[in-house]
Every structure is written in structure tokens, then in C-alpha cells.
UniProtKB/Swiss-Prot annotation:
It comes from Mus musculus. An acyl-CoA binds at residues 29-33, 55, 74. This is Diazepam-binding inhibitor-like 5. Belongs to the ACBP family. PROSITE patterns: ACB_1 (PS00880), ACB_2 (PS51228). May be involved in the energy metabolism of the mature sperm. GO terms for biological process: spermatogenesis. InterPro entries: Acyl-CoA-binding_prot_CS, Acyl-CoA-binding_protein, Acyl-CoA-binding_sf, FERM/acyl-CoA-bd_prot_sf.
């Protein structure tokens, strides 16, 4: 697993044409943030900003995970989503 593989997975995700659920988007987002920035380091968003709050909470779940582990999981999740793509 390398930085190049991670970047390729990031590019692949942008090319997906099939539907991706909000839950899947949040999960992939959380691993992307952990892989690129490490533990969540932003203030808690206001409860009124539902989207930002959901993203924050998803990222916080990965607290303590190494960037390399997050990259591996991100790549695996993107591969799962690619397999769901319509032919």
C-alpha cells in the first residue's frame, strides 16, 4: 500500500457513476480525513449545521487510527464501491 495507491483510489472515487448512499459517503469521508489529516482537530460544529455535524462525528470515530491504517481502509472501501458500479 502506498501513497500512489491512495491517490488512485481518490481519483477512482470521483469517477463513480453509481449511487452511493449518504452512509457510505460519510464512511469514506471519515477515512479520507483520518488518512490525510490524522485525528479530528476542528471545533465541534453547531448542532444546527446537520451536515457538518455528521461529518465531524464520522471523522471522530476514527480518533487514534494511524494514517496508514486509514489509507488502507479507504482504498478497500473505494474498491467495494467500485464493485457495486453498474456494468
Amino acid at each position: 500500500m502506498s501513497q500512489v495507491e491512495f491517490e488512485m483510489a481518490c481519483a477512482s472515487l470521483k469517477q463513480l457513476k453509481g449511487p452511493v448512499s449518504d452512509q457510505e459517503k460519510l464512511l469514506v469521508y471519515s477515512f479520507y480525513k483520518q488518512a490525510t489529516q490524522g485525528d479530528c482537530n476542528i471545533p465541534v460544529p453547531p448542532a444546527t449545521d446537520v451536515r457538518a455535524k455528521a461529518k465531524y462525528e464520522a471523522w471522530m470515530v476514527n480518533k487514534g487510527m494511524s494514517k496508514m491504517d486509514a489509507m488502507r481502509i479507504y482504498i478497500a472501501k473505494v474498491e467495494e464501491l467500485k464493485k457495486k458500479e453498474p456494468c
